[in-house]
Amino acid sequence: MATPSMLPQWSYMHIAGQDAAEYLSPALVQFAQATSSYFKLDNKFRNPTVAPTHDVTTERSQRLQLRFVPVMQEDGQYTYKTRFQLAVGDNRVLDMASTYFDIRGTLDRGPSFKPYSGTAYNALAPRAGANNCLFNGSGANINTLAQVPFAGAITVNGQAAVTDNTYQPEPQLGPESWVDGTLADLGDASGRALKASTPRMPCYGSYAPPTNENGGQATGAVERRFYKVTANNNNEADALLYTEDVNLQTPDTHLVHQVSDDQVTGVQGLGQQAAPNRPNYIGFRDNFIGLMYYNSNGNLGVLAGQSSQLNAVVDLQDRNTELSYQLLLDALTDRSRYFSMWNQAVDSYDQDVRIIDNHGVEDDMPNYCFPLSGMGPLTNMTAMKVNNQNFQTDNTNVGPIQKIGFGNVEAMEINLNANLFKGFLYSNVALYLPDAYKYTPDNIVAPANANTYAYMNVRLPAANLIDTFVNIGARWSPDVMDSVNPFNHHRNAGLRYRSQLLGNGRYCSFHIQVPQKFFAIKNLLLLPGTYTYEWSFRKDVNMILQSSLGNDLRVDGASINIQSINLYASFFPMAHNTASTLEAMLRNDVNDQSFADYLSAANMLYPIPANTTNLPISIPARNWAGFRGWSFTRIKQRETPALGSPYDPYFTYSGSIPYLDSTFYLSHTFRRVSIMFDSSVSWPGNDRLLTPNEFEIKRYVDGEGYNVAQSNMTKDWFLVQMLAHYNIGYQGYHLPESYKDRMYSFLRNFEPMCRQLVDVTNYATYQSVTVGHQHNNSGYASPLSTFNPREGHPYPANWPYPLIGVNAVPTVTQKKFLCDRTLWRIPFSSNFMSMGTLTDLGQNLLYSNSAHALDMTFEVDAMNEPTLLYVLFEVFDVARVHQPHRGVIEVVYLRTPFSAGNATT
């Protein structure tokens, strides 16, 4: 097999974008045309759906799929390795694009899995409402707090209607009309109550498993306690409680207001307040990212002919197999459409959560709630009649119920719209604030490990940071949330769908189909012969599973057990003589199969220490022929695993992995980038708004008016991105064609924002009131956190300053932008405006054989945690596959200008 140095024209074959007919032999072109009616060869994007109707001698040729059983399996601690023997018979061609791994096993998503918001138990109960219970008083005294709805005469033997006190009276039964107990006397009544020995928990979220088939919950003897109304002078019992101990649990709630240990069993313990555990969807990653082990320090994958034993798989440390697959799918299909077979459900976020469009609440009309009787308050009355000029009591045909309400109907008001919006902001924004803006409530002990679900549950956001009055009237993302991963959220619809594919229980069995993504073999036509096909699959739950909260699933008890892996594959549905003709021509090295990696880029990660704003990087001297440009973004170190290891012990996180799945969200933190070659070339030239060799991305102070679109992005950078993504520049700005404006493109994700702030320098009476001293809705909300019990009394609000009306204070305008998912791109061309075509003329000075070193300097916003600069150097990453003889497969990897691999040496 020839090496790249012997065939230099390969370096530029793909730059010119030749049609396949220009470099395939005339015989193969003719073959493709002759068979196009039922089999499209094209550029190896095939849809083989029509089986031939003649010259088929065995039923095997018409089978749509064949199952290959592994010849070797190794179930290790961190990986599951499997090996297959692919036997491709004569007159057949195996379609590697149709192959997938069929994996079965069991999954324990751990106790942190919660696939819903709120609670499943007593969700209608007030958060601090108590269960019917007995509780301790002073000394050995026992107190009672209970509701008795079950009517019936009480004797010393209990209630007549109660025949089995292990479940009767049932707590869900009582009078069916509002009349009973108000207009009509209810009489004696009974109910169930928890003994004082059962721990105190609010009714909201409380659950006790049944201990008999009738639904009773007692774990011991049921005891009766009798009561009478204190005002009654007789010695008859008016109420009866059947008290019991139960196995009280809170499967999906926790306490946010907890009293000290010495008060739990007393009266103060009745006022503890519960909140639901945070939702945490857990499922396999989009397209099973991370499951297949694409090693970066050797070969974990093998495709080798048994005759030659040369491995066709050469994965390089800086290749982007997973990210390439994500962007390739976006170019081919609509990523918003889900495809359950490959677990394709792209990570997304709610736009209204990332950027809050706070246009207030439409609460012009008050909302009332009324008593069930529809009138009141009712007063006991005595009927009167006229007697001459006076009144006297009327006892003629007058019943005992005489109740009248004075004035308007009694009502209570609630601002439904304001509460709904406040609840939306709390659940979707405030709870996802960085941990520095949260606190642990009194008497609650938070775990030491901040990556655990238990820790994330107990932490509460401080009040007034996110509320209905913050940035009211503006479309603005809270500044502290800009650097928080928006895809780690329970409104990530793709993750929710993938979690639901596995069901709604912690323990589940799975049966999944995993496609091959490695570019050199995922579209290969495998000719007759016997081949060894081997791959490893990760078992690290943090890598293969994804959670809404990004908690450490290893610590939180998740685990996976792979039981079997089979391989399914299809042969092309061709007549034998047709297949043998195709084989004969593909054996000719003129018709070698060439595959280009979709991104065709070498990636490099450069650490950015915490609070760093300047990062220089250097690339040693090399020939830049065939170089296409740079793409770059910023990712967090804690969200980036070491891909070279099957198990990274420092990867204590399970949220989205931008490095692999393109959930980038820190692009807005770049300020400028300079690019300097060690040559005299002033690249990219002086034909832009700003100085050569420098790209200014955003300006906080824009005295010259260089910013664009009511944001702080510069016109120059906007121009560069429009040209790089859509080739829209001097011909005027307009919306790009839909096939270019995909999910990861620039314009679809560019979000400019603007708001006004108080001009503190020109407003003499401005007071910088700290968050703890700001009050708004005092008496109707908690000063600590939205979840806490409300406190205070009605009073005029002291925050925020009015920005509108006759008393509007002086303001300054603040601008910014977000551009999630998108990689910033700088195309490479010495004539900067000729980005659409890469020509020898345009890159003449840098195409010379002399090598050039490259220095780049990135200026970024400071962040309080370590991050990584993720740079993609866009090269030509091409594999050329040659199958000269039966059972022999040879691959040459060409990578200009960064590195080359050769599977034949």
UniProtKB/Swiss-Prot annotation:
Source species, domain of life: Viruses
GO function term, MF aspect, one: structural molecule activity
Phosphotyrosine: residues carrying this PTM: Y893
Origin species: Canine adenovirus serotype 1 (strain CLL) (CAdV-1)
Keywords noted in UniProt: Acetylation, Capsid protein, Cytoplasmic inwards viral transport, Host nucleus, Host-virus interaction, Late protein, Microtubular inwards viral transport, Phosphoprotein, T=25 icosahedral capsid protein, Virion, Virus entry into host cell
One Pfam assignment: Adeno_hexon
Subunit structure: Homotrimer. Interacts with the capsid vertex protein; this interaction binds the peripentonal hexons to the neighboring penton base. Interacts with the hexon-linking protein; this interaction tethers the hexons surrounding the penton to those situated in the central plate of the facet. Interacts with the hexon-interlacing protein; this interaction lashes the hexons together. Interacts with host dyneins DYNC1LI1 and DYNC1I2; this interaction might be involved in intracellular microtubule-dependent transport of incoming viral capsid.
Subcellular localization: Virion; Host nucleus
Protein name: Hexon protein
Modified residues (N-acetylalanine): A2
Induction, per UniProt: Expressed in the late phase of the viral replicative cycle.
Family (UniProt): Belongs to the adenoviridae hexon protein family.
Site feature location: Involved in interaction with pre-protein VI: G729
